[in-house]
Structures are given as structure tokens and as C-alpha cells.
């Protein structure tokens, strides 16, 4: 499973990725970003509570705060949306979490390294029966986080599908939950989740 960061909950809402960019911009300027980080924490807590999970992201948010203060960069900041959502999804499904930075690679020029990624990702996926790999990011040769362009979780999904040798890759986006039809075509499609594997 390859999740994106949480998107808009309603029309005038803000995507978590945009919240993270704004939060990091303040940190990068040496300004207080506590209120912005607290809003992001609340957003994830709402998801955790909605799923009735016994999950605490305090440690992860502590690391994020420290790295923002250390000016870890926009790529790192933006990637945390997928990373945190991946932790939640893995907890909810009972799957392993595989940090994309350990299995998705870019070369020294910032270009996607398909050969290295496929080799490492295939081996890592073989160690897990079921896994969640957060979308949108990977790592540079020096270990720093690098993101794909906006919408990069779709790219990650196809990369993971190739490495896993799946027969079918399904890309579900822009809806809250799992629906039986595209809500842009069918008004109020029924939420339907009977089985996921």
C-alpha cells in the first residue's frame, strides 16, 4: 500500500503538504512555527481518533520539529505528510512500514535511480508479507530526503508495483475512504469497504 499525505477534507481546507511547506518556511526563517506544527499534529490526531487507533506520533513529531529547526529542507518537510500517513495506515492495517527513504533512490544529479531502487525495494518487500511504503519521496546518495514532483505518490505506487511483480496496480485518489464509484461522476457514491488485502 502506498499512501499520499492527507488532502483537503472540504473545499476550503488546506492539504497537509501545503501545511508542512508553510510550517517549514517559518522554521527556515528562524520564526516560531509552533502553531502551524500543532495544527498538523491535530490533523493527524483527528485521523487516528477517527480510526480508533492506539497510536502516538509524539516521537515522530519531535524528530520533525528538531529537523525543521536544523533547516532540513523543503523536500524533507513535504515528505513528512506521506511518512506520517504511512505510519497510520500501517498501524491500521497491521502491515509493516517501510520508510521510502530506505528503498527509493535518486542519483547525485537528483534523477530517479530505477535500477538501485528496484533491487533494494524488491529485496525489502520480500521480507514482508504486507507493507506500507509512503509515497512521494526517497533519498539522495548522502541520505537526504528528495521528493518527486507534486503527485509523486502515484509514481511511488507504480515503482512499488513493479518491484513487487503485481498483476494489477490500482491508484485511488482524492476521496475520503473507499468508494464504489468516482464521486466526480456519481453523486454521493456509497462508502464500501468489505475486504482489503
Model-predicted segments: where are they?
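Nucleotide/pyrophosphate-binding catalytic subdomain
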Residues: 1-197
Amino acid at each position: 500500500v502506498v499512501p499520499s499525505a492527507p488532502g483537503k477534507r472540504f473545499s476550503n481546507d488546506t492539504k497537509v503538504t501545503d501545511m508542512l511547506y508553510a510550517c517549514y518556511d517559518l522554521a527556515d526563517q528562524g520564526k516560531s512555527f509552533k502553531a502551524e506544527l500543532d495544527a498538523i499534529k491535530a490533523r493527524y490526531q483527528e485521523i487516528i481518533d477517527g480510526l480508533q487507533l492506539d497510536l502516538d506520533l509524539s516521537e515522530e513529531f519531535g524528530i520533525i520539529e528538531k529537523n525543521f529547526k536544523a533547516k532540513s529542507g523543503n523536500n524533507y518537510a513535504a515528505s513528512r505528510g506521506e511518512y506520517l500517513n504511512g505510519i497510520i495506515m500501517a498501524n491500521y492495517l497491521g502491515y509493516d512500514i517501510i520508510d521510502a527513504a530506505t528503498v527509493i533512490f535518486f542519483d547525485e544529479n537528483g534523477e530517479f535511480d530505477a535500477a538501485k531502487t528496484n533491487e533494494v525495494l524488491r529485496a525489502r518487500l520480500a521480507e514482508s508479507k504486507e507493507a506500507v511504503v509512503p509515497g512521494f519521496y526517497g533519498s539522495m546518495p548522502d541520505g537526504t530526503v528528495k521528493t518527486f514532483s507534486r503527485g509523486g505518490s502515484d509514481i511511488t505506487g507504480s515503482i512499488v508495483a513493479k518491484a513487487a511483480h503485481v498483476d494489477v496496480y490500482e491508484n485511488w485518489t482524492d476521496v475520503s475512504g473507499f468508494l464504489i464509484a468516482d464521486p466526480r461522476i456519481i453523486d454521493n457514491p456509497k462508502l464500501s469497504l468489505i475486504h482489503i488485502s
